[in-house]
Amino acid sequence: MALIKHVKGVHPKFGDDCYLAENATVVGDVVMGDQCSIWFNAVVRGDVNSIRMGNKVNVQDGAVLHCTYQKTKVVIGNNVSIGHNALVHG
C-alpha cells in the first residue's frame, strides 16, 4: 500500500479511479483529479505548499513533485505524463 500522510491536518485528496503503486508516497496538500497514477518510488510532496493535478496525470517511476514554502505551488493540467526520475519543483 502506498504511503499517504497528512501534514498539519491536511490530507491528500484523490479523484475517482486513481492508481498508487505500493511504494509511492503522497504527502499533505495534494489534490489529484480522476484516473491519475503515481508509480513506483514516486513522491508527491505537498508539505510546504499545494500540489494540484488535473485528470489523467501519470507520475512515472522515481519522479518527485515538490513546491517552495510560501512561494510557488505546483499545478499540473489534464492528460500530462511526468517521466521517470523527473523533478518538478514549484
Where are these regions (language model features)?
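Acidic/polar low-complexity surface segments
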Residues: 1-2, 70-72
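A structural motif detector for beta-strand N-caps
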Residues: 12, 17-20, 24, 30, ...
